[in-house]
């Protein structure tokens, strides 16, 4: 899980999800998991 000020989709499997006001990227590739904060 990477914590970044700006989250971007890395590949076409990445999905942007907003959970409790936190923007997250989920993907089948674990390295691509990110959250904003």
Swiss-Prot record:
The answer, when asked if Ribonucleoprotein is one of the entry's keywords, is: yes
Q: Where on the tree of life does the source sit, at the highest rank?
A: Bacteria
Arranged from A to Z, the UniProt key words for this protein are: Ribonucleoprotein, Ribosomal protein
Looking up Pfam families in the UniProt record yields: Ribosomal_L36 (PF00444)
Q: Name one GO biological process term.
A: translation
- InterPro entries found in the cross-reference section: Ribosomal_bL36 (IPR000473), Ribosomal_bL36_sp (IPR035977)
Q: Does the keyword Ribonucleoprotein apply?
A: yes
According to its record, what are the GO cellular component terms? Answer: cytoplasm; ribonucleoprotein complex; ribosome
Q: Name one GO molecular function term.
A: structural constituent of ribosome
Q: Record's SUPFAM superfamilies? A: Ribosomal protein L36 (SSF57840)
Transmembrane annotation, as ranges: none
Which protein family is it in? Belongs to the bacterial ribosomal protein bL36 family.
Please name the PANTHER family in this protein's record: 50S RIBOSOMAL PROTEIN L36, CHLOROPLASTIC (PTHR42888), LARGE RIBOSOMAL SUBUNIT PROTEIN BL36C (PTHR42888:SF1)
Under NCBIfam families, the record lists: rpmJ_bact
Q: What is this protein called?
A: Large ribosomal subunit protein bL36
Native organism = Photobacterium profundum (strain SS9)
